[in-house]
Each structure stands twice: as C-alpha cells, then as structure tokens.
Amino acid sequence: MAAKGELVGSKVLVRNDRDANRLYSSMYGKPSRRGLQLWPEEALFLCEIGRLEVRSGNVRISPEELMDRFVEEDPRFPVRYAVYADLRRRGWKPKPGRKFGTEFRAFRGEDERIAVKVLQEELDEFTAQDILEWLKLVEGTEFELVVAIVDNDYDLNYYVFSELVL
C-alpha cells in the first residue's frame, strides 16, 4: 500500500507515523515536527515506483503533475532528478549534498559513499580548477567525488575523480 503524502509548497509531507517510519527506514526523507519531509526528487521517485500517493488538499497529483510543479520551482529539476532516479535504481541511497558543494551524497552498503556533482552537458562548463575545488570539499571525508554529466536526452555518464599524491 502506498504511503500518503501532502504537497506543501515545494515539499511533500508524510504525516502518518507508520508510513513515515517505513519510508525513513529506507533512507527517504527528513523527520520534522510536521511529519516526514520528502525533498522533491524523493517524492517524485516514490510516486513513480508506486510507494507514495501525493495530494494537494483532496486532489490526487499524478507524477507528471508533480514533475511540472517541481520544474516551476526549479527549471534544472529534471536534470537532477534523472541522476537521483538512476542512483536509486542502481542501489544507492542519495541525500542532499550541499555541504560538499554537490547535489547529492549517496550511500550503498556499509563502505560505499560518493558525493555527486550534477552537470548538464550543453549548459554547464567546468574547468580542471573547478574539479580541484570540488575535490577539496570532499577531502578528509569518506566520500569519493563523482561527476554526473547529463546530456539533452537525459543519458548519464559518471566520472570518478580523486587527487593523486606522489
């Protein structure tokens, strides 16, 4: 049975404790006083796989409508979402990664941790200096830097960067 969520601004809240606990145990959302707060990528992914039903008032919102609403808030949402959904399908558990200057930090198993920078092939330019700056942000953590490049067809390529000390 799908959890019930309520669209509040650009966030989705799951207020039912049982639903919230079930999702949180799968590394979705962030607990708050108002319920489990899902960020847009999580909410859309859960809708698409049938684990969440989102409503605004009494009106059920389809995954397509949810995508449209999130794009209104952030035109780059589909690019980030493509990476988020791909990581989830590959067994990773992505969370927001802003403190690393990346879109996501993701976990898989006990030891695998990555910080994922998302770039859109046709729009985002970056230099070797940018890569060094991103590496500095993850330096001293257990995270490995991964750059996800999304093309106009939403095909993804992942590149792993690390600093080689000689």
From Swiss-Prot:
Disulfide bonds: none annotated. GO terms for biological process: tRNA splicing, via endonucleolytic cleavage and ligation. One of its GO terms (cellular component) is cytoplasm. One of its GO terms (molecular function) is nucleic acid binding. Coiled coil: none annotated. PANTHER family: TRNA-SPLICING ENDONUCLEASE SUBUNIT SEN2 (PTHR21227:SF0). Belongs to the tRNA-intron endonuclease family. Archaeal short subfamily. This is EndA-like protein. It comes from Methanopyrus kandleri (strain AV19 / DSM 6324 / JCM 9639 / NBRC 100938).
